[in-house]
A protein has these predicted regions:
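Terminal appendage regions of diverse proteins
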Residues: 1-160
Length: 160
């Protein structure tokens, strides 16, 4: 108990632990808020750089990203563009390649299936995944195949 008191720099160990837990909770909330703001900012950049394929808005995100943030970006874009839109993420989470596809409900009802698209492209990153017709993710082991996987997704989108 003396050692714990020294580590916490307090004679009242229980009070010091409660204070540390409260501070930790505040820091978590602050980090979550910062992540939400960053997601909004990145989503705005992705929206500004959209392309169009066969009358469909395609929003792409490449590069190193946290998987959880990519999902948040995809859904933020869907809120801004709820029809005729597809989000394609070809990202690295650490050294792990990740593919993310989100299609709007109207496209899912007309033959676009995010899960099918992701599964096909995931082969190129030596991975697998899936999800729902509107949203799917895949992870893999071959980061070198990420660019080819992105190209495959774009090829599939253009062919539907």
């Amino acid at each position: 108990m003396t050692e714990l008191s020294g580590i916490l720099n307090s004679s009242n160990v229980i009070q010091a632990i409660k204070k540390t837990i409260a501070e930790n909770g505040e820091l978590k909330k602050e980090a979550e808020n910062m992540l939400k703001e960053r997601i909004k900012a990145v989503a705005a950049q992705v929206i500004d750089n959209r392309t169009e394929v066969n009358g469909i808005n395609v929003y792409s995100l490449k590069g190193p990203r946290i998987a959880e943030a990519v999902k948040g970006i995809a859904f933020a874009i869907r809120e801004e563009s709820p029809e005729k839109s597809i989000f394609v993420g070809a990202t690295l989470n650490g050294d792990k390649p990740m593919l993310t596809v989100l299609v709007t409900d109207d496209l899912a009802q007309n033959g676009f299936n995010a899960s099918t698209i992701v599964r096909e492209a995931a082969k190129l990153i030596k991975g697998g995944g899936g999800g729902q017709p509107q949203f799917a993710q895949a992870g893999g082991k071959n980061a070198e195949g990420l660019s080819a996987a992105y190209d495959k997704i774009m090829e599939i989108i253009a062919s539907i």
